[in-house]
């Protein structure tokens, strides 16, 4: 089916709870299942999502929610059997959940500038977030999957099972997940976003993700047409795929496309300098560091 996008995720998927989407593979799936107040465009610019607009003032930022953003249907959850429109209290719950010690979200830090009790639903369509200090990068932090809006009744009813039974507003919804085997997402028929011609998104009917840890098998799947996409190619396969000028090898030009696009990524090198655990370590010497 040309409307099914297939790829392999060699690192696997450990959770579908956006509060724990700390790695790239988890972020990709969270972006398919959930929306936040704002999101990044393909050009890495902040654009509206669940929030149609916002304004800053001396206290922080006020978000105005768009109408018609629906949670995907959840037949086992009272109130979500036919889906439900997102309201401001859902935003408050989702963000405050990051601070819940029982959730233990690694994304709690995105709220470091937010006042305690400073996430407020002014009415069903307006959310105020008060900051402790002026912090313009805050909007950028809200584009991360950590800030995704979830359905409170689904989280509370499912408890720890929410990691495998998500409830969001994204372009796709979960159809099947067998850990270490495959994950399948189906098109969310109630998704709110449309393209410039008014056509409802997404264009795809489904996304199929395999979890094959061997990169050689993944590359073979790409060459044989079982996968539509591969990122982060191992150097061992570069000679087969590409020519000396960095383009596609002639034998692959009829079947594959090579695209180079901007990619938002941060790497760092950390040096452990705790003298309680590294007695005698050269890293304790600032001249070495």
Outline where the language-model segments fall:
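A structural "hinge/loop" feature
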Residues: 10-27, 50, 75-81, 137-147, ...
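Acidic glycine-/aspartate-rich tracts in secreted/extracellular proteins
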Residues: 13, 68-69, 134-135
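Extracytoplasmic/periplasmic ligand-capture domains
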Residues: 42, 60-62, 66-104, 160-163, ...
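N-terminal lobe/hinge region of extracytoplasmic solute-binding protein
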Residues: 8-58, 96, 165-167
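Short, well-ordered beta-strand segments
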Residues: 5-10, 230
């Amino acid at each position: 089916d040309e409307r099914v996008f297939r790829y392999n995720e060699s690192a696997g998927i450990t959770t579908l709870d956006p509060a724990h989407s700390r790695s790239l593979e988890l972020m990709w799936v969270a972006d398919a299942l959930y929306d936040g107040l704002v999101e990044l465009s393909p050009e890495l610019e902040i654009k509206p999502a669940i929030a149609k607009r916002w304004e800053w003032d001396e206290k922080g930022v006020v978000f105005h929610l768009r109408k018609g953003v629906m949670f995907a249907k959840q037949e086992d959850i009272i109130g979500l059997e036919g889906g439900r429109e997102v309201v401001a209290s859902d935003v408050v719950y989702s963000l405050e959940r990051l601070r819940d010690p029982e959730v233990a979200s690694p994304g709690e830090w995105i709220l470091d500038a937010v006042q305690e009790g400073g996430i407020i639903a002014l009415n069903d369509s307006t959310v105020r977030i008060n900051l402790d200090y002026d912090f313009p990068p805050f909007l950028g932090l809200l584009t991360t999957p950590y800030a995704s809006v979830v359905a409170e009744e689904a989280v509370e009813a499912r408890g720890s099972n929410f990691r495998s039974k998500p409830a969001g507003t994204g372009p796709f919804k979960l159809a099947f997940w067998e850990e270490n085997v495959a994950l399948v997402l189906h098109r969310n028929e109630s998704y709110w976003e449309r393209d410039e011609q008014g056509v409802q998104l997404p264009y795809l009917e489904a996304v199929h993700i395999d979890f094959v840890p061997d990169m050689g098998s993944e590359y073979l799947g790409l060459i044989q047409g079982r996968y539509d996409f591969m990122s982060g190619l191992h150097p061992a396969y570069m000679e087969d795929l590409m020519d000396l000028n960095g383009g596609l090898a002639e034998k692959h030009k009829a079947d594959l496309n090579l695209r180079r696009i901007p990619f938002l990524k941060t790497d760092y090198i950390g040096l452990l300098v705790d003298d309680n655990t590294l007695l005698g370590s050269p890293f304790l010497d600032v001249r070495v560091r």
